[in-house]
Structure formats: structure tokens, C-alpha cells
Amino acid sequence: MKRSAVGSFFAGAHVAEAVSLAPLTTLRVGPVAQRVITCASTEQVVDVIRQLDAPAGGRGAGPLLIFAGGSNLVIADTLADLTAVRLANAGITIDGNLVRAEAGAVWDDVVVRAIEHGLGGLECLSGIPGSAGATPVQNVGAYGAEVSDTITRVRLLERSSGSVRWVSACELRFGYRTSVFKQADPSGSQPPAVVLEVEFKLDASGQSAPLHYGELVATLDATSGQRANPHAVREAVLALRVRKGMVLDAADHDTWSVGSFFTNPVVAPDVYRQLAKMVDGPVPHYPAQDGVKLAAGWLVERAGFGKGYPDGAAPCRLSTKHVLALTNRGAATAEDVVTLARTVRNGVLEVFGITLEPEPALVGCVL
């Protein structure tokens, strides 16, 4: 590590020491990192990670965390000697109907730029916090759209070899909130490859992608499968997200979260039929490639966990707007979050026999 009059540097990237990671995540929990290395360019990302991964790379014995927007992370408060690499390579380029975003680009900035250029396909994903590089990892989706609908290829740094290459979408094994990246590293703490850049192929007709999500279709007074003005779709999506506490607002503790903490479980058809016999009234469900997708929020509420649970002054509670969001009420720790998540997951399992899976990366902690 080199020092100069303007600070310390590692492989050309700026280094800060003894940095609290909590303010760098949307959940606002986490440890103090021994150092945070901020990479302002893709070249710095490659050089820094190659050097840290080398046998004598100067990383030390502590763990390594690679992150960008910090919107899908729960980092244990107890992690010691942590080196964090923060991706701040934020370039966005547009060539015809192709949009390329570097990993550290703010995701909503990518959506806005695409819409400003008359390109449709990303508007349903408006308002999602985080970075562009995180989107293919869990195949980010909302309101009837997923990034796998438009991703054509991803540029990667393969950590075992140090090589950089473009990988086509067909190699990424996209599924519901998953990809080859998540399948290789379920915890999100030791990725075998680092996303450097993502390319999207969008619709240059000036129309949105076809609308299928019922709540959004109704808001726009449209019909299922209809296309609309991407600007109008974006505004409708943002309004829906605000109502659910899913647009970041420093003054609103309902937004101090990782978004939906649990994915919607996909179960076998016979499991769905048994569930439908157990309860009064309809069970929200949707067709899925491998079975029937259930609504995790419905399961959570029917298991006895309502909005704002637990009542009182608990530092971590379910959002008052959306039961799938576990929120930091101002003084929560990662352990508080994990404890509540475990309580909810175990409660759903006890009532319905269904295990909910966490959506965020759990670094140094387990449910």
C-alpha cells in the first residue's frame, strides 16, 4: 500500500482505514472495516482484486468483501480485520438500443438514462436501490419484469485465473432471483467472479415492455400485455414503491431495509394443493417453471407476523407498509435483523411447512 499527501492507495485505488460499513448499506448495519478500497474505474477493480487474490497480495488473514450499492447485504457486526472493495466504476454508455453499465453505476440512473433515450424494457425496475453490477447476480425483478429479459451479456473478472471476458446471457443460468453467480456462491460472500459491466438490449420503439403485473396494469388503466409510455410506467412504479416503503428515504425508517428479505417460494403442485385445503379463502399463487410460486408476504402475514411486528421499541421490525421488509428503526444491529428473520422464517415453517429463503447476501451470519 502506497501513501501520499492525499491519502493511501492500493493498486491505484484510494484506501480509507477504520471505516464503518453501516452508512454504506441501505440496512445501515455492519462492522467497522479495517480498510475500504474504492475503485473508481473498471481497470482499478481488476487490478485491486487480482492483487488481493494473489498469494502475497497484501490482503492479510481477514475476510474480503466486494460490494457496490450495499442494498442487498446483511454484514455481521462481529467481522474483524475486514477488507472491503467498493466498486465505484459508474459509466453508462448507450449505442443505439444497447445500454452498457459499469458495475458501480447506480441502477436507477441506468433506468433513467434508458428512458431518456426512448428505450423501453427497464421501466418496471424503476426505484430499485443498488448498483447495475448486482442486477444479474440475483436476476433482479419487480412488477412483472426481470433483468434477464433484457441482458445480452456480462463482462466478468474470473478470480481463479484473473482473466476478463464477456459471457453471454445464455451462460448465466438465470432463474427466479438466481443466476450462475448466486448458484456458485449462495451466501454472496465469496463470489468466484466479479461483474464488471452489464449490457442490455432494449426496445427502441418508444414503448414499454408488455405489462403483466396486475397492480401496475390497474394503476395505468391498461390491459394485460399492453405497452405504454415508459415515462408513465416509471412514475406508476415509483408511486407503488413509495406506498410500500420501497424507495430510499433517510427520514423514513420503513426504507432502512434490504427490500424484500425473503423470495417467493416455488413449491410442487401437490404442496400448493395441500396448502389450499388448509386455509379459508384463495391462496395467492402464480405459475412457475418448476412448480407453483407462492406469495411470501401472504405466508408471513397468515403465520401471524403483521406489519410493524413486533410491536413496541424493538430495534428491528417488519415495515409498517410491507411485511417482507425487515427494517432498522434506527439502532438495530445485524444480529437484531438475523434474529427477526429467523423468527419469521421459523414461524412460517411451523404453520405451513414451507421454508422461506433469504434474498440478501448474508456475510458472516446465517439464519
Curated annotation (Swiss-Prot):
GO CC, any one term: cytosol
Location relative to the cell: Cytoplasm
FAD-binding PCMH-type domain mapped to chain residues: 29-205
Subcellular location, principal: cytoplasm
Similarity annotation: Belongs to the MurB family.
Record key words, sorted: Cell cycle, Cell division, Cell shape, Cell wall biogenesis/degradation, Cytoplasm, FAD, Flavoprotein, NADP, Oxidoreductase, Peptidoglycan synthesis
UniProt xrefs under InterPro entries: FAD-bd_PCMH, FAD-bd_PCMH-like_sf, FAD-bd_PCMH_sub1, FAD-bd_PCMH_sub2, MurB, MurB_C, MurB_C_sf, Oxid_FAD_bind_N
Any one Gene Ontology BP term: cell division
Active site location: R177, S260, E359
Pathway named in the protein's UniProt entry: Cell wall biogenesis; peptidoglycan biosynthesis
Gene encoding the protein: murB
Enzyme Commission number(s) from the entry: 1.3.1.98
Job description of the protein: Cell wall formation.
Lineage top rank: taxon: Bacteria
Cofactor (UniProt): FAD
Pfam short name (any one): FAD_binding_4
Name of the featured protein: UDP-N-acetylenolpyruvoylglucosamine reductase
